[in-house]
From Swiss-Prot:
A GO biological process held by the record: transmembrane transport
One Pfam family it belongs to: BPD_transp_1
Chain ranges passing through the membrane: 10-30, 72-92, 108-128, 155-177, 204-224, 261-281
Boundaries of every ABC transmembrane type-1 domain copy: 66-282
Subunit structure: The complex is composed of two ATP-binding proteins (UgpC), two transmembrane proteins (UgpA and UgpE) and a solute-binding protein (UgpB).
Gene giving rise to this polypeptide: ugpA
Species assigned in the record: Brucella suis biovar 1 (strain 1330)
Lineage: Bacteria, Pseudomonadati, Pseudomonadota, Alphaproteobacteria, Hyphomicrobiales
Protein name listed in UniProt: sn-glycerol-3-phosphate transport system permease protein UgpA
Superkingdom assignment: Bacteria
Localization: Cell inner membrane
Topology in the lipid bilayer: Multi-pass membrane protein
Amino acid sequence: MQKVTFPNKILPYFLLAPQIVLTVVFFFWPASQAIYQSFMREDAFGLKSTFVELANFTAVLSDPNYLHSVQVTVVFNVLTALLAMGVALLLATAADRVIRGQTFYRTLLIWPYAVAPAVAGMLWLFMFNPAMGTFAYLLRRNGIAWDPLLDGNQAMGLVVVAAAWKQISYNFLFFVAGLQAIPKSLIEAAAIDGARGARRFWTIVFPLLAPTSFFLLVVNTVYAFFDTFGIIHAVTGGGPAKATETLVYKVYNDGFVNLNLGSSSAQSVILMAIVIALTAFQFRFVEKRVHYS
């Protein structure tokens, strides 16, 4: 591999400058403002802020509604990640076996990733809308009382399916790349030894996909935490009865709807700490178990 050298020593810093500026403006500055606001409390008119130390954090952590949103977030994250990764792996395995029209099938499978989260949510809401949705009509015809606007479990199921559908395409790309990187000689050797399709997959293919699966687990966790706001906002608005109010959506409700900036900032700081701790734990303790030589 040819080594690239820069004759001008300042050029690398100019190339890094746009990314550094974007990171500072859109991450470090908002994060610092959130940390600052989490220790403050505004008056009823928003004219004066008072330093209240850890009162906002204490109020948040003792709030039953916040603890409920933590439970909702855990359920939503686990179900979304499992469904999105499971279906993507199934589709990638099937697409890897297709010979004719392989490019066409793969292109169709990655199109949903280009759909905006809010649009994806509206698509699923229209299909399962209890008043005019096609699938809602089929469910009622089969004796299922379908109404996600009133039933919390049905609402959770709908947003999980919509969020997973949006992420399947992303996972599919990486699983296909991982499958293509597996030497065919290993699979052929296992077939010669008498291992059937399912056994070959679980003993040869799946362990070699562990690094890819770990990477996607981290990505899907972060996705479910932050990038599903548009879906929840479009489909359920956090309802019914806060059944789909995740941590991110509660930050929005408390900060932009109820205008409780101190509590909202404290929640965002806690959420940021949770994601950082969870990601660090995954890389520190899980990553060691997924690499094969």
